[in-house]
Amino acid sequence: NNAGLAAYKINSFNESIEYFNLCINKSPNTGYFYNNRGLSFQALKKLNLAMEDFNKCTSLDPKYPESYWNKSLLHLFQGNYKDGWELYEYRWQSFAKEWARDYPKKLWLGNESIKNKVIFIYPEQGHGDFIQCYRYIALLKDLHPKKIILEVTEPFYKLISTQDLEIEVIGPNIQPSKFDFYSPIMSLPLAFKTEISNVPNKCPYLLTNLNKNKIWEKKFEKSNYLRIGLCWAGNPLHKNNHNRSMLLDDFSELISLPFEYHSLQKGMTHEEQKIIKNSDVIDHQDSLKDFSDTASLIKMMDVIICVDTVIAHLAGALGKKTFLLLPDKSSFLWMNERKDSPWYPSIKIFRQSTLGDWSKPLKELISDLKS
C-alpha cells in the first residue's frame, strides 16, 4: 500500500494501480485499498472504475470518510452537483478537520428560514475557494436575514469590507456578535441547491476598491499594446502545486510576443526575479500588499493568463477576460474536459493532454492570443 501511495505521489498512476491490485488480491475486504486505487483510476480519467472503487470502499467500510469525500469530488468533477455537494460535507471528517468549528448555534445548510435572523459565515480552505463562494452572500441577502456577519482572512479584509452588500465584515480571531445560524462558506453551494443549470454566475460580483484603483491608475501610462497580467505559480504548500504550477521559463515564447506584460506573481524565487529583471515583464510584487491591490491591478489589464490559483478566481469574479492553464490532473471546480467554466463566464480553459507537458495548452493559447 505504501509503495502504491509513493507511486501515486510521483504521478506514476499505472504503477500505483499494480501495487493496489496486489494489496486487494491479498486482502479483498480492506476498504481503503479500493479507495486508493480509485484515486489512481481517477487520475487516469478512468472515472467509472474510480467510482466503482470508491463505492466498493464505502460498502466494505461505511465509516471510512475519505471515500465519501473522494466520491464527492468525482461527482462534482463530472458535473453531478446534487450528489457532489451533499457528499462534500464529509470533508469535516476528512482533510478539513482543521477548519471545523463547533458553535452552540445551528449549522445552516439551507433548510431553515433565516428571515430576520443573524447568520455568521466563516472562511475555510484556500483563498480561491473563498472567492468562488463569496457570490452566495448576495443570495443570502435575498433571504432577508436581520444581519449577515462574514469573517474574512487578513488579505481579503480591505477588498471585502468595501463591497456594497451592507453586511458586517470581521477579520480573523474576532469573536462575532450574537448570531442564530452559522455556515462555513463552502457549504453555501449545498444550501442553495446548486446544480450546473443554476450556478449563480452573474459576473462581476466583486468590486475593486476605488481608492486603490486611483493609486494603480497613476502607475500606468497610456498604452497601445494589449496589457496582459501573468501568474505562473500557486501556493507551494498546496497539495497539487507540483502539477498546477508552471515555471517562468515555460512562458518564454509567450512573453516574446509584442504585448505589454505585467507580473501578478507573489513570492518569486531569486532565479525568477533575475529572469523578470532581464525581460520586458513589469514586476509589481512589492506593491501587492493584499487582494485589494491585486484586484485593482487585474482591473487595469486587458487579459489575464494564469494557472489555477486565487488569481483565476479574482479575475473571474471581476469579469475579466482570463486564459486559464490547467494540468491534466486539475481541481473538481474546472470539471472534466470543459473549455469554459459554469462559474466564471469570462474564463477560457487551456488544458494539458499529458500531465506535466504545458506545450499543447500554451501553443493553443498563443494562437488564440494572436488571433
Where are these regions (language model features)?
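Alpha-helical solenoid repeat scaffolds of the TPR/TPR-like class and their adjacent stem/linker regions
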Residues: 1-371
